[in-house]
Structure formats: structure tokens, C-alpha cells
Amino acid sequence: MKKVRIGVLGAYRGTSMINYCKRADHAEVVAICDKSPEALDAQRAAAEGLDIAFYERFDDFIEHNMDAVVLANYANEHAPFAIRCLKKGLHVFSEVLPVQNMKEAVELVEAVEESGLVYAYGENYCTCPRPMK
């Protein structure tokens, strides 16, 4: 089975997803982007020996060869960055909040429909039994 190549935007908030993908048989992290050099340095240290590219600029990150992007960045950036990813041909998994207003909601829905790609909104359920253990 071909692994899904995943890029993660948000090195701090995205740490759980990065760690999950490192262990998964069906996915691999191929790129990590964050504005913070310190956050990238921490992920570089944790990724020693793995073939992961690191970016400080989203414009460079989005050009990397990947299949999907996890948006674990600032909430006010989720819709604009999701739309850019979809237009680039990338599937999107977005953390909360997906949009800031109705205009962004309409633009995001239109981008998903036009692209035919998967957009997933990852609501956290911290009160579910498993996370509470």
C-alpha cells in the first residue's frame, strides 16, 4: 500500500499528528512548516534519520511533493490556507476553527466542491472516554 505523504503546518500544535504519522503504516510526514525557528528545531531533533523537509514559509511548504496537509496553525489562517491547499490539489485536515465568518465558509465549501478533494474538520472530543484515561 502506498503511504499518504503528509505535510503539517504548525510544529507545536501539530506534534500529536506528526507523532501519529511517524508510527502509521499508511502515512508519512514529508514536510513540516512553522513560523517559529525554535519549533522547527525541536521537530528536526525529533525527526533525526527521517526524510522530512522543514519550512518557515507557507509559500515554500505548499510546493513540496505531498498528498495532504494538516492545518494545525492559527485558527484565523485555517480557511485561507485550506483553500490554497485545495486549489493546489492537496487534501486537507483542519483543526478547529475551520472558518472565522460566513464569507470564509462559503469560499471553503466552494473550494472543496470545485476540487473534488477531501476536506476534514478535526473537532477535538476531549470528554470522550479514551482521552480522559
Model-derived segments and spans:
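General small-molecule cofactor/ligand-binding pocket signal
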Residues: 30, 53-55, 120
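Beta-strand-loop-alpha-helix segment that lines the small-molecule cofactor/substrate pocket
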Residues: 67-68, 74, 79-127
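Oxidoreductase and adenylate-handling cofactor-binding alpha/beta cores
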Residues: 127-133
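Local beta-strand N-terminus motif with an aromatic residue
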Residues: 29, 51, 66-69
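Short acidic low-complexity segments
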Residues: 52-64
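N-terminal Rossmann-like dinucleotide-binding module
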Residues: 1-49
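Acidic-histidine catalytic/liganding microenvironments
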Residues: 23-26, 64, 128
